């Protein structure tokens, strides 16, 4: 059986990993074994944080909506419940955007929610 050399494949793999590790500090960007460990860890962090980002943004939106709703004399959960009963289907991302950039429109939504809660 002929001998199989691995040099070309190994060099390609090493170059790929070291390219991904570019910008890392010290040996993590120079030595293949250390760089490979760091790249694998970095990919795990990226995977985890892509999921965490969704939770973090939802938390931020809720905080902004709550702050704006309280400025209009209403708590977050009462506001959301009032909108739900009124049949207003605006997601939290858009509500947070309105709360920050268009307080007048947000105030009108608060009035709609208040009216719906009082009419039950």
UniProtKB/Swiss-Prot annotation:
Gene Ontology annotations of biological process type: ribosomal large subunit assembly; translation
Record keywords: Ribonucleoprotein, Ribosomal protein, RNA-binding, rRNA-binding
SUPFAM superfamilies referenced in this protein's UniProt entry, alphabetically: Ribosomal protein L20 (SSF74731)
GO CC annotation terms, alphabetical: ribonucleoprotein complex; ribosome
Signal peptide boundaries: none
Disulfide bonds: none
Any Pfam family matching the protein: Ribosomal_L20
Family: Belongs to the bacterial ribosomal protein bL20 family.
Function as written in the Swiss-Prot or TrEMBL entry: Binds directly to 23S ribosomal RNA and is necessary for the in vitro assembly process of the 50S ribosomal subunit. It is not involved in the protein synthesizing functions of that subunit.
Name of the protein described by the UniProt record: Large ribosomal subunit protein bL20
Organism: Desulforudis audaxviator (strain MP104C)
Gene that specifies this protein: rplT
């Amino acid at each position: 059986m002929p001998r199989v050399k691995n040099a070309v494949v190994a060099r390609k793999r090493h170059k790929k990993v070291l390219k991904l590790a570019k910008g890392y500090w010290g040996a993590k960007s120079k030595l293949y074994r250390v760089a490979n460990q760091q790249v694998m860890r970095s990919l795990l962090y990226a995977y985890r944080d892509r999921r965490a980002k969704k939770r973090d943004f939802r938390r931020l939106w809720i905080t902004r909506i709550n702050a704006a709703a309280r400025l209009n004399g209403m708590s977050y959960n009462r506001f959301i419940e009032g909108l739900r009963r009124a049949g207003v289907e605006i997601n939290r991302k858009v509500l947070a955007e309105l709360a920050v950039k268009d307080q007048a429109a947000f105030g009108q939504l608060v009035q709609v929610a208040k009216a719906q809660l009082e009419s039950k």
